[in-house]
UniProtKB/Swiss-Prot annotation:
Residue span(s) of domain DH: 465-657
Gene that encodes it: rgf3
Record bears the keyword Manganese: no
Domain of life from the UniProt record: Eukaryota
GO biological process terms on file: division septum assembly; positive regulation of mitotic division septum assembly; regulation of cell wall organization or biogenesis; regulation of mitotic division septum assembly; small GTPase-mediated signal transduction
Keywords, ordered alphabetically: Cell cycle, Cell division, Cytoplasm, Guanine-nucleotide releasing factor, Phosphoprotein, Septation
Protein name (database record): Rho1 guanine nucleotide exchange factor 3
Amino acid sequence: MKLSNELFHRSSKDHGGKSRICLDSSEDTYPPHSSSPPSFQKRLSFSDFSTTRLFSPPFLSKRSNNSPHRFSYSPPQHPASINSRRVASYTVQSSPSRTTYRQLPNEPQNSAAYTTYSSFPNALFDDFSPNNPLDTDPFLTSPGNKQNTVDSFRPLPETPVSPGGSLVHPLPRPPLPSSVSSHSSPYSTTSSTSLYSLYNDISLSCSPEPYLPLSPTRSPARTPSPIRLYSSDALRPQSPLSPSVEYLTPPNPYSLKSDISSTRQLPKIPVQDYASGKISSPLITRTHRRAQSETLFSSCREPWLVGKLYKWCKEEVFTALGGLVHEGVSRREVAQVMATLFTIHIASMEFLIAEIIAKNILGDWINYGLVEVINLEKLQIAFTSNEPPSGSGVLPFLTNGGCYSYICRSRSCPSKYQCYSCRCARNSSLEFTSLPGQSSDTWSIFWNISSLNSLPSSLSKREIARQNNIHELICKESDYVADLNTLAELFRDGIVQQQDAIVPSNRVADFIQSVFGNVESIRQLHSRLFLPQLIMRERLQGPVVSIIGDILLEWIHAAKSSYINYAKQFPLADETYKLECQRNTYFARWLAACRSDPRCRRLDFQHFLQRPTQRLQRYTLELDTILKHTEQSSWDFQLITQAVKELRATCEECDAVIATVLEANRIRDLSYQLLFKNHESVNLELRDPEREFFFEGIVQRRSDSRLDWLDIHLFLLDNYLIMAKARKDKRTNASRYVVSKRPIPLDLLVLSPKMDDFQLKSNTNKFLGSLAGNLPQESLTTKSKRKSKVNLELMFDATAEKNNENSMNSAVFEKSQLYPFTIRHLGAYTASYTLYVESLQLRKLWVEKINVAKKRHSQKINIKNPFALKVVSDVAFQYPPSDLVNGNEPLNSFNEITLVEGSSIDRALNEVAWKHPIVSEELLPEPIAYGDISCIAQFNDYEGHVSVLIATSTGIFLGAFGDSSDIRDWKKISSQRRVTQLGVVEEFDILLELRDKTLYAHKLSRIIEMGLIESKIAVVIGTPHAVSFFKIGKLSEGASVKRERTLVFYKEGLGNTTTIICCEPVIGLGHNYQKTYAFKRKDVTSFRTLDDFHVTANCHSIDCFKYSIALCHNKGIDVLRLDPKLAVGFPSPSVLNDTLFRNRINNSKPLGVFRIHDPSLFACCYQFGAVFVNGEGSMVNKECWFDWIGKPNSVTSCHGYLIAFNDEFVEIWNTRTRKLNQIIQGNDIKYYPSNSDWLANGKYIMFGMVHPQYHDRHLILALNKAKTNSFIIED
């Protein structure tokens, strides 16, 4: 790709009354010089334009052909003769809406119609007169003067050249009258030390010229293009400014919503009104901050003086933008204000050029310490306390109204001639024309730099490589913009503008929106903002570009949202166009025909559609290359580093967005493709917008007969793992998947940590199709196909196989290897599946994906969990040595349930790790007890804290439970063994202990004081060695006067005939009611038996209510009322009349009866599920029941939830909605009841399991009610 280097060279040509400036024009106003120019040894710098010099035309001077700035004119080429190589050209066109200095020959001269308000600084002084002889160019005569029309095409004089060959600039204007200060005039001949005179003695590699619009002089052939990108249109306001408005909120100068063919409409207002502050600027006022631009711009009447400009920006602009020293203001906003000031003083200057120059000025101020960067990420700057040196120089492009030509700045009537200066800022108008290109010149060829010039020798190899990289970035960006134009104009507009309907009219609008919806925003962003700024930066600073990171950083800030939106829609666009190709053959043929268009370069539509996503990734590579050749001490290095960082973050976000959309599309497809056998169905919740798709693939599984291999399509979602078999629909040939096994919820999915080595695939062998674990000594060499006869062949001898192992075909050997992994389905549908994949890497990938899915699922449901877990004890209690396998494993590793990251148990352990860290397994604290934990009791101590009693096979231990307690501080208070049950009656200061089937009553306060249980002074309740269990409850009695009584129920007897005895504590004489340890100290001397009940069944649990108790036995549930004495079966016979419930209840063990959220309803819990009945035992409706996920051993109720405990998991159900809310997985789970349905400050549900990290230790947990739950019900 070739880029034009003559941005500021102009020629004029008339086209039907319109003025056009084109590099290809054959009617150049200024013919080339015939004399050979002298040698030009060095590149122009600011030393050539000191404070006492004005602009001279360096590109029209006599220079040698070896000069890097040599200029050559080429005749216009016919379009047919233009090289077909893909090039990109940039032409310059004047804006038709702007006032000009030309008069067409056939138009009458009208001074009123062609009144031009001078925009150079002298127009502000009273003594300025356009008729002043000093303001007239002696070599150009106005066309209005008929006496001089013959000399109108007279060439301009050559720039004077000194005898030594160096360029000599024209003499400056004579000084102004003494009444005008020399500092206020741009023509003052007083020399002073300039800030920019530092460029005079610095080498070219360290002296960028950010303000000189230098450009190379080579002019390659240009190809006209219908694609025009008006950069100036996007950078200026689109509507005229109303002078009557005092405060304005203008459109963004970088707005991308303007029409592409519109031009910048400047207000027809004299520039003096801007400078005097009579009206407001259209670019300075922000939406949330009103700044009076009349005061702001009128305070800077001499913007060409660098010192005055810096003072104005520091004192006026920084304050007007609301900047704070510690926060700063946006560099872009300051640059826009400065650019607005420049365009006010030079009304015809392009805003893009003015803004780039303003940014270059700010960059130099940063380098010299006058401005500091507060926030590099947002490019926030602040002005320092440093001041520029006196006489810090001028800005030549603002002097003399933007041009040093007298006739250009002084004539008040229009002229048909362009200004001869290639750097005239008054006639700068940009129009970029771009065509795709296949090749590009290097930086040295582009700037016509040869090895004979002094420039390459003054630059290091690293800097030369950097300049090549920057130029390559601009070339590729031009190609990218051309491809975006092709996508928008050839394909999108072609579909709409085609006479024959390519896409049916009823869906063409949706098609355009789905495929091309976000193309235009990216196209406008690059063609109107990013690419023009890159080209302008290269022209203004070239051939050595000193800084480019600021443009990149501002671009990525503006482009981030557009690319994310494009990435979000890209999967839909790709799917839509492919579907249209399948069902619309005319559209497919049209796309194929478009490939012959030169703009397509034989590339298909898919290439252009995915161009933005691919280009975004390639930016990082190109910027990394530029960064590698950039000095780390430079400011540009910091800017590019920040741009690369944000670019990579944008790429990652785009990848995540695309992945999310692809997952959503795949889930949508699965909702139509999944089929269940035998009309079975599981609600997979595929319509849930939060559903996530993680992975899918084909695995193999042995058939139930273990004779065949089955291909299983595995789908991994964030809630289920689905195993299905692929099937083709015979009618539509669409893919369908028949679910072969019941989908596994991730809450019930267990991935076995133990994985065998690879196995050899074989259909049958003499062991009925079993697979060998490693390299087999005997294995089958042939496979039997399904429904074929079994072929048993001779086995290889082990020795022969070992000898021939190296000579085996590795491809065949690898193909027969399979790598297994095992998954388990917990619950009522418990099952284990061993799946096989073809490689070790694929097995690792599946394991990783399953763990990630379980982690993500745990994180999503954590906020919905009604209970959190608190650790009561982590490593204090150890399993008995007889239970340990291999020294330290108390469980089968094959059935082990591993810890899931982000689960409730993982969060509880992480919370403990902060307070009680364990550095390594070698530093694990020693256990305080060995043996199984039989029971746990809890009570409130004298400070109101919860204390816990834990009975093991080696004794009883006392500890504290709470946020401030030490979970490893346990005190042994008894060495008695065979303790099976503990209970506390806080009101009577009693601890009940069931040991060796004998029920003992101890004084709790004495145990706490002594730290020891004294068995000799304990009170025995009931018949020794005959008590099976006990239960503590508080019941009410009496019809008129309600009185609560604390009762103790215990069971005596064995076999089918048992007796339930009810007793209460008896308080002896001399009791006192002093509150000690939060107990009412009532000296209980004995227990009095109140009543007994004979049950002709084996009773195993008792549940107490306000007026009655429920007895659970092997024949069902009986409810006994104490006053009056009455027993009734529960639930009522009406429920048992239903065959469904009768079979379920009769074949299931009752686990308890609990009051739920509604006080009038009770939950009768069995091993199969729960049935909700009223006080009479009747069901409210047929839907008042549910089945457990597993087969629980015990059930309890807490805060309106039913909690069922299984050996491998805990399931928590909401009694209001009858839905499963939480599942907690674990190994060897055991529930430890409190043996009391009433405690003073409530009760905690405590249970234990094998520690998931240290398998020889007990982990005791307590359910803690979450604060986010909507209701709390006390039992």
